[in-house]
Amino acid sequence: MFKFLKEVVAGSGSGLKDFPYTIGETYASAWGSWTHHRGTSKDDGSPVSIFSLSGSNPQDRHMVAGRNGVKRLRTVRHPNILSFLHSTEAEVADGPAIKHTIYIVTEPVMPLSEKLKELNLGGTQRDEYFAWGLHQISKAVSFLNNDCKLVHGNVCLASVVVTQTLDWKLHAFDVLSEFDANNEASGSPMLQFEWLVGMQYKPMELSKSDWASIRKSPPWAIDSWGLGCLIYELFSGAKLARTEDLRNTASIPKSLLPDYQRLLNSTPTRRLNPSKLIDNSEFFQNKLVETIQFMEILNLKDTFEKDSFFRKLPNIAEQLPREIVLKKLLPVLASSLEFGSAAAPALTVLLKMGSWLPTDQFSIKVLPTIVKLFASNDRAIRACLLHHIDQFGESMSAQTVDEQVFPHVATGFSDTDGTIRELTLKSMLILAPKLSQRTISGSLLKYLSKLQVDEEPGIRTNTTILLGNIASYMNDGASASVFKVYVSVEDTFFTADLTGTPD
């Protein structure tokens, strides 16, 4: 039997020597008897989380429950449930004894309790972030209870982890079991591993092992109680020590209190369904939740709604926790722009948010999106990029400009819109110094020679000024050629310049 279970967990049955991940430092907290480690992939160095559970006896009940947790996490997929990557079980010599250890590898996450200490939020910002997190965990619980007819069994602060984008994920599936409503008369345990749950987290029917009552209750009854425990721990700032402490509601926000009390109703059949909490809770009606929700369904919004939203977003972002804006909103915004669901006003917001990042982080989190956007066919996007190029142009490498950016920017030299031609011309003050001699001589000068006879007098004049400004970046042959053109140009229009200000 153990051999079968081990194969279920390990897949190929590989030992730790073949483990494709490096186990790193340990977090201070984790759910149950598990240990939560930082880790990295041996293939590409990408970060992961590694959870380990050890025992001297492979048949130890904690190990058996741990294998249930592995199986459940592997098979249950949802955006608000921790993403499973890999698992294995290894036997390692620990002195004269053999230690059996189960390893689960997941997306990189951090215990919620530790992330909250790190963020150190207060007041409205804290409540808005808690609302977003609770909204996510409620969706995970609703999915398990209502869609899958599964019971998690121990929803609490320790069973929640936080991703690098500050999203909350539900995990700790060792207790998770099917909701066995078709066997109401049975007195046998429905949750095989309920002994793992601390007594302070158990509703009355579970603490009494009243399985008949549990089977007659809705599938969300136990986990709704758990959501109440999570809410208490979040706002009190302390781990739940006794069930009686749940009656202390002094720290619970008034807008959440009615829902909190319904989640913890002493009658299981009257407890609030998590789906109703998601749909109706007043506590979830705040700027952060509404902003993220809007951005996640951006492709369903019409142009007017998008434009209105993005014109308001800079002011909203100023009021939200800076780390949440940079780690959650900015990646969603960048992705929306890349896939075409966001329009030009969103680019202005992206650049504003990006200005709050250190230079190295801007190059990692914002610049790749900007480079991709230069290939856009949206004229408004192209115009916005050119208009703001002074904000990011210096951050682009010469190779990126020469190979990825200039070929797309160059189409603007022959655009039918004079404004685009003018912006393209002015962008060369930033881009030309990063171009190769081959590109300058073979492409740029040809485009500029055409602009010298442009129908717009301002463009003709600015082209001549630009040639003088970039001559120092050319080789001797090209520079001499430009100088001859520069001194021989006669144009009666003289009020334009590359900065857009009159002479």
Predicted regions and their residues:
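ATP-binding glycine-rich loop module of kinase domains
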Residues: 24-75
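Activation segment of protein kinase catalytic domains, centered on the conserved DFG
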Residues: 119-135
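Short beta-strand micro-motifs within the conserved protein kinase catalytic domain, predominantly
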Residues: 83-100
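Protein kinase catalytic-loop region centered on the HRD/HxD motif
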Residues: 139-150
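Conserved short submotifs of the Hanks-type protein kinase catalytic core
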Residues: 95-113
